[in-house]
Amino acid sequence: MMIDRETQVVDCRCGAGLGKGGGLAQRGTLSEAGRAEVVAIAMSPGQRHITKPVCEITYGMRKENIQVSVLVLYSGSGIPESGMRTGSFVLSPVEVAQIEMHKLAVIHLGNIKDHVVRKTREILSQANIPAIVVSQIPVDFEDFAEAGIKTRLVMPRDEDIRTKGIVMDMVSGVTRGDSCPRDKLNLIIKYVKTTLDQLEDHKGVA
């Protein structure tokens, strides 16, 4: 893939796309970048989870010479039950390993705050990785910390921590099925670059 003067190699999926969601492949698939820097995590394409913004976010990061893989979760289209019990939304061991191959995760979620928080907790409870959460509905560090999720600015009490990974930043206002606004894309890229720099300097993550 040629982007301006830079070349990126992407190992694409063997599965065909669903014809919607901006061209992303079917659930349970990974397109892997040449270097394992960032993984964009998308929910399964379907009526509730149209993943169009993920393609634009991925392309925008690649234009900035950020190496991005894309993982479409197998069970990501499930509706969370009360307490996010096993069976409603889980990661497979393969998906956890695929996520942890990378330095940073960008998690694309939706417009129900409880679902955003619970799915973030489920992912980061299994995958030990810093993450940037992209959603339609606004969420903040306190929302995540109250659910036992480690964050860059607000931490739960030690006995309440329920995640291995940590939320570094979040960007709201990215609507499923719509184009990602330019200002939101710029903010995502800014947070990704800042976090990667912090990781390079061994700063900023617990």
UniProtKB/Swiss-Prot annotation:
Q: Could you tell me the Gene Ontology terms of the biological process aspect for this record?
A: methanogenesis
Looking up InterPro entries in the UniProt record yields: Me_CoM_Rdtase_prot-C, Me_CoM_Rdtase_prot-C-like
Question: Which keywords annotate this record?
Answer: Methanogenesis
Q: Does the keyword Ligase apply?
A: no
Its subunit composition reads: MCR is composed of three subunits: alpha, beta, and gamma. The function of proteins C and D is not known.
Q: Which protein, by its recorded name, is this?
A: Methyl-coenzyme M reductase operon protein C
Recorded source organism is Methanosarcina barkeri (strain Fusaro / DSM 804)
The beginning of the lineage is: Archaea, Methanobacteriati, Methanobacteriota, Stenosarchaea group, Methanomicrobia
